[in-house]
């Protein structure tokens, strides 16, 4: 993937008050992001909340778009950025009661105020990062949509013998396979299978990807449907809709085999 450039800056102008009646989808998104970065700079404006970041090895990239329509309250005084240590923020989100409302606010960006019906917490933000992290511009030849729970099951099966997963798509078939010192495995899903929701091939494709990164991403969002696009030896693009309009896109570079 392309190089990622980071320029440190301090944003002391951002000011907002937003609320979710059920923060489940936001919790899932933050946990998925935390799998590839330790610190995250979020952008917020009148239209929504955004994040885009790449892991240190430049193997995986996550792009989050959460429009204001998915939030119960959306009051933005000043657009801007705010950055958090995600380990700390995830601990806060994990402590929430199931479907307990969540309010986030800040005046100036240095402190994030977190409020639920039973708790109030103030968390100091960290220095924000302005990141040049363009999305890969790729024309994909193969697309399929799959149940997240089924994809999670397939990944676990392939992980039992390999650190990588090979994906092959034909006209009506998606084949997942792995091979290692202890054996090999192959799983096929054909058009018409209830877990294979959609398949569309411009031409047959084949590529190999890291199971470590795939598993890390989907384990927090596996209750959703994944739409996967890829081409021969090209980065994979996964889209999952977490709420009515909130989407996460995950890009994963292929393993280059000799």
Residue ranges and their predicted role:
Residues 165:
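Polyanion-binding surfaces on beta-sheet-dominated domains and ring/shell assemblies
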């Amino acid at each position: 993937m392309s190089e990622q450039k980071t320029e440190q800056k301090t944003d002391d102008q951002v000011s907002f008050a937003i609320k979710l009646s059920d923060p489940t989808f936001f919790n899932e998104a933050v946990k998925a992001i935390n799998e590839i970065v330790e610190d995250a700079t979020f952008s917020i404006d009148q239209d929504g909340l955004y994040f885009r970041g790449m892991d240190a090895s430049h193997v995986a990239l996550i792009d989050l778009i959460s429009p204001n329509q998915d939030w119960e309250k959306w009051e933005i005084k000043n657009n801007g950025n705010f950055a958090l240590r995600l380990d700390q923020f995830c601990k806060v989100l994990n402590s929430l009661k199931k479907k307990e409302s969540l309010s986030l606010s800040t005046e100036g960006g240095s402190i994030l105020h977190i409020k639920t019906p039973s708790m109030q917490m103030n968390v100091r933000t960290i220095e924000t990062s302005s990141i040049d992290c363009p999305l890969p511009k790729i024309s994909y030849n193969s697309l399929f949509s799959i149940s997240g729970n089924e994809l999670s099951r397939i990944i676990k099966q392939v992980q039992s013998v390999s650190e990588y997963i090979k994906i092959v798509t034909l006209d009506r078939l998606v084949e997942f396979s792995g091979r290692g010192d202890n054996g090999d495995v192959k799983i096929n899903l054909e058009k018409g299978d209830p877990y294979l929701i959609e398949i569309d091939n411009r031409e047959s494709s084949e590529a190999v990807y890291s199971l470590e990164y795939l598993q890390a991403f989907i384990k927090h969002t596996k209750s959703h449907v994944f739409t996967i696009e890829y081409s021969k030896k090209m980065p994979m693009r996964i889209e999952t809709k977490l709420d009515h309009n909130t989407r996460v896109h995950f890009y994963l570079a292929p393993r280059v085999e000799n």
